[in-house]
Amino acid sequence: MSADALKDVIGGGKDLYALLEVSISSPEELEAVDAAQLRAQFRRLALRYHPDKRRDDTQQNDKFVSVQKAYDILSNSSLRATYNRWLSCRLFGDPERRRLVRELHQREQLQVRQKEPMDKDIQNIQSYGQLLRKMRHLRIPYGDWRPNTSISRDSTLVETCTLRLLLRQNSTTNSKSSMLQLFQRAKLHIVDLYFSSRNVDTENDLVLYAVMPDVDTMLDLLNNWAVKPPLSEHILQVQPRVHTDYFHFKTDISLDKTITEAIDADNQYMSSF
């Protein structure tokens, strides 16, 4: 974990100990927290919030990321010493100064939240508009344009064609070789199988990831797993590894005035031909 991450945490006024559910009420308690206590809290919370167990709950997934970041910083002795000095001053310093700093920070954060999303989207739209205007000026048909970057088809399909299987935990599903045999009997070709690192032996289910060779095979298993015995006898649920909710955009942003003016100028230019 880098010093930049620590700077962001301090700038955001975050209490990392509170994220790990470690109670701090005095400077002495702050210094008394040891690595073993932090590690135990992280493991407990990681099991509670890990995405493998709460895949559809984005709030819980965000909580897991916050817990991971908190532990990464506090488990680094150098970063933790710097953070503890800041937190001690924030929690146990002058009350009036803390109140003023907190109010100032809240106002700054509100201004950032209101400005940043629109600025970022507008920059992207403006850059895209500049590209289109260059193509039009050079008389390059839009349909002839190709990206100038090379992306491996195999690397993108690994994400697209990976399914998350929730299985009943038993001697068969705990064995990769046994699961490969079940896929073969179901006439499903598999590129790879791997278990989630967060599976727990004492639970009734476990998570297995199946990498399919192509989209058609992936969709076949995703949509028809219930009619593929004997594999289906062990499956509780099948989902894409990359959840489709990540591709939903719910915010509508009005175009910047400079963009609408550029569009009008382009329309006037084209109408002159």
Curated annotation (Swiss-Prot):
One of its GO terms (molecular function) is misfolded protein binding. One of its GO terms (cellular component) is endoplasmic reticulum. Keywords: Chaperone, Cytoplasm, mRNA processing, mRNA splicing, Nucleus, Spliceosome. Its main location: cytoplasm. CDD domains: DnaJ. The keyword Chaperone applies. Residues 15-87 form the J domain. GO terms for biological process: ERAD pathway; mRNA processing; RNA splicing. The keyword Membrane does not apply. Gene3D superfamilies: DnaJ domain. Disulfide bonds: none annotated. It is found in: Cytoplasm; Nucleus. Associated with the spliceosome. Involved in pre-mRNA splicing. May be involved in endoplasmic reticulum-associated protein degradation (ERAD) and required for growth at low and high temperatures. Belongs to the DnaJ family. This is Pre-mRNA-splicing factor CWC23. The gene is CWC23.
